[in-house]
Amino acid sequence: LPGRSFITAVGIAMSVAVLVTSMQWIDAINRMVDVYFLDAQAQDVSIGFGEPRSSEVERDIARLPGVMTTEPMRAVAAKMRAGSREEREAVQGLPANQELYRVYDAQGHELRLPPEGLVISTMLAKLLEVGIGDRITVEVLEGRRPVFEVPVVDTFETYIGSPAYMDIRALDRL
C-alpha cells in the first residue's frame, strides 16, 4: 500500500505540473497578442497601396477630417542572399522614430532603426548565416527590381517570423 500511495502522489504531482505548464502557454500567447496588436500597432486605421506612392499622398491623408497623425511604412518583397543561402522575406521600411507602428524585441524593448543598414531577426540571421557587420544582397521583387548590398547593423530576438527592417528613407533611396 505505501508504494501505491507514492505512485498516486507522483501521478497527481505530474498532473498539476502539466496543468501549470499549459496555463503558462495561455499567458504567453496573451502577452504576445498584447505586444503585437496593442503596443506595437498604435494606429486605428492602416491604408495600404499596391504600388509605392509619393510623400504627397501621406500629406493628403493627414489633411482628412479626424486624422491626428500619419506615418509612412513600406514593405518590399525581396530575396535576401548571403553566400549560398537565400531567403524570401519582406524588407519593412519604417521611420527612424516610429510612433504608430513600433518594433519590439522578445524582451519588450523598442527597437530604433539606424539611418542605414538592415536590422534583422536572429532567426533570419541564422537562416542566412550572417551576423552584425556582414553584408546581404537584397534583390527587390517589385518595380525596377534593383539589387543592392546592405550591411546587417543589428539583430533582435522576435516572437514570430524572421522580419527585416530598414529606415524608410534608406529603403526609398535604393
Which residue stretches match the model-derived regions?
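Alpha-helical transmembrane segments of bacterial inner-membrane membrane proteins
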Residues: L1-L174
